[in-house]
């Protein structure tokens, strides 16, 4: 599990409090199994309730979403989840798993986020990190688009939004 290994590696170098924000459509069961009982980490997973894995691991904050969940419902749930993360934990590093599979064009995702909704999702997470003045590492995750270009476009959009966010943050004296 790349996110859990990264969190453990960083913590071996310096004892950071690490939040893993997993927005891949599949529950972050590996991350939950590895970090779920670690008080120096916080794992958030927004995932398709009826999607693989069918037996979910306990995480710090797991939110199962119904099939067909679209932009408005997803973004409202994510916004509340980020508030809950901040209420329960103070991250010093965020690892963001930016799944492409919540996109409406994904063959396996079963959610219905548009490209605009995916961009708003990324803006919420990047803004959350910026408000906390917390560095963020982004990993591209998931993506089984009917057309590979759709998956590429989703990931490219995430990178472009992060580049814009990084420029904004560095002009304020810190880099995410």
Model-assigned labels for residue ranges:
Residues 1-167:
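A general "terminal functional-core" signal
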Residues 164, 168-176:
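Single conserved hydrophobic/aromatic residue that forms the stacking wall/gate
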């Amino acid at each position: 599990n790349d996110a859990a290994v990264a969190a453990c590696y960083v913590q071996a170098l310096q004892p950071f409090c690490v939040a893993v924000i997993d927005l891949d459509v599949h529950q972050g069961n590996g991350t939950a199994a590895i970090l779920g009982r670690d008080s120096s980490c916080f794992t958030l997973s927004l995932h398709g309730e009826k999607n693989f894995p069918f037996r979910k691991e306990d995480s710090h904050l797991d939110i199962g979403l119904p099939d067909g969940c679209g932009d408005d419902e997803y973004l409202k749930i994510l916004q509340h989840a980020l508030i809950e993360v901040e209420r329960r934990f103070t991250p010093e590093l965020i690892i963001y798993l930016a799944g492409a599979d919540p996109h409406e064009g994904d063959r396996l995702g079963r959610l219905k986020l548009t490209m605009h909704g995916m961009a708003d999702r990324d803006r919420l997470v990047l803004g959350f990190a910026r408000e906390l003045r917390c560095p963020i590492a982004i990993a591209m995750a998931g993506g089984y688009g009917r057309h590979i270009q759709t998956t590429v476009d989703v990931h490219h959009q995430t990178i472009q939004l992060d580049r814009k966010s990084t420029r904004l943050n560095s002009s304020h004296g810190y880099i995410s």
